[in-house]
Regions:
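Condensing-enzyme catalytic core of the thiolase-fold
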Residues: 1-440
Length: 440
């Protein structure tokens, strides 16, 4: 609510050395939304199999802590003595983690290094080369078969399920920026089908190293500015961020029976795979699928990436559905949490769901960090959409209509129709609604 910007200068693991350019000679971010000390866990709450070393996938313990915190907030106990009929769905797929990198260093990278040394020193005795290899191995974290498996996707999800005493399906998936929506969609399906009575859905973007940032910079327009203002008139690119979120889901009847605190209802989720579909088509699909008039949505937690062409698509989509504003007509508030924490990549839609759910629960329209010069299409009286520069009470004109919010997300390929045709999912919408029992 304080419109705080949490972007900070890159740390030593992400910054470029002075005087160097990134691999693609493209703009490289100078700031990022970083987890810092938040990337932590409470060891006593988790069954560590051994002492953790630098060669293990420590993302796992952070994700498990997030899952624990979500369960506790929902009134459930991690390490329940009786198995829970529950499922775990996680959006998580960094190109590498500490575990996989350590194994590459012990194998392929070590072989390449020794090959280079042999080429530069062809007359070196084999005993000396063996000693060099031994010293290189000693400088690395000790390899461990269990830690290697925990660096893979299937063990990642099953570990969390075991720690939470969930006896059902546990999967890790990668839908890019839409991973949060995909995880939530699968979790809802688990509940509807009866496969689970409780579902954990989450998405995670762990600390981003330089190698990952350099790779992303080849395809994503990054901004070199120190702040990100979604829907500003002049945009040059996005600023990355780290983060994660987990949600505990139940069928509404079960949640009310158990007297749970309900932050929001998931009314509909739509993920578009057709390159011809623009955000308005996906938003219409999401609202029509749950028989919700689109103009009853009062808040759009937008993608708002800072990429000009992507933001223009979102604005056009909203104007296409809401039309030109007329006196007494419905208005829809727009904002994006990316101005506060950056673009958290696979966790971006999960971050949007957190913000929108809390907005519904507290009946407050939350502000975003306001741009000095808002986009012309939003800063005029003819627009049915407006940017939230200040927090305001969420007042509805119709006492019989519940408050509703839509969370939008788009993969970076959404602005490239040719490339998008070969990819699985371009944009997504999650429609949330306040719980009527809370409202009354």
């Amino acid at each position: 609510m304080s419109r705080r910007c949490c972007l900070s200068p890159l740390g030593p693991d992400a910054e470029l050395p002075v005087g160097t350019r990134n691999v693609f000679a493209r703009p490289y971010p100078t700031r990022m939304g970083q987890l810092g000390p938040l990337f932590s866990c409470v060891p006593s709450m988790q069954n560590f199999p051994r002492q953790v070393n630098a060669g293990e996938n420590q993302d796992l313990y952070f994700a498990t802590q997030l899952a624990f915190d979500a369960l506790v907030d929902a009134g459930l106990r991690p390490h329940s003595p009786t198995p829970i009929k529950g499922s775990v769905r996680i959006g998580y797929a960094p190109p590498f983690n500490a575990s996989t990198v350590n194994w590459l260093q012990h194998t392929a990278f070590l072989d390449q290094t020794m090959d280079i040394i042999r080429r530069f020193f062809p007359r070196s005795p084999e005993e000396s080369l063996d000693e060099v290899r031994k010293k290189l191995v000693e400088s690395l974290p000790a390899p461990n078969a269990s830690s290697f498996l925990l660096g893979t996707g299937y063990r990642f999800a099953s570990w969390i399920a075991r720690e939470c005493s969930f006896a059902g399906v546990a999967t890790t998936m990668d839908a890019g920026i839409l991973s949060g929506a995909a995880a939530l969609q699968n979790a809802v399906a688990d509940l509807v089908s009866g496969q689970a009575d409780v579902a954990l859905a989450g998405a995670l973007t762990p600390p981003i190293p330089r190698a990952y940032l350099e790779g992303l910079s080849g395809a994503i327009p990054f901004s070199t500015r120190t702040e990100l203002y979604p829907f500003a008139q002049e945009q040059e690119g996005t600023i990355p961020g780290e983060g994660g979120a987990f949600f505990v889901l139940k069928r509404r009847t079960d949640a009310l029976r158990d007297h749970d605190r309900v932050y929001a209802l998931v009314r509909s989720i739509a993920i578009g795979h057709n390159p011809e579909d623009d955000p308005s088509a996906i938003l219409a699909q999401a609202t029509e699928g749950s028989e919700i008039p689109v103009k009853t949505v009062g808040l759009i937690e937008a993608d708002g990436s800072g990429i000009a062409v992507a933001e223009q698509r979102e604005i056009d989509a909203v104007h296409r559905l809401w039309g030109e504003h007329r006196p007494g007509g419905p208005l829809v508030a727009m904002g994006s949490v990316k101005g506060n924490i950056g673009h958290t990549l696979r966790a971006a839609m999960a971050a949007g769901v957190v913000k929108a759910s809390l907005s519904l629960f507290n009946r407050v329209l939350p502000p975003q960090i306001p741009p000095e010069h808002p986009h012309d299409s939003l800063a005029n009286l003819a627009s049915s959409a407006y940017l939230l520069g200040e927090a305001r009470p969420w007042i509805t004109g119709d006492s019989s209509s519940p408050r509703r919010a839509a969370v939008l997300g788009a993969n970076f390929d959404a602005t490239d129709p040719v490339g998008a045709a070969a990819k699985g999912g371009r944009s997504a919408v999650i429609v949330l609604e306040e719980e009527p029992e809370v409202r009354s």
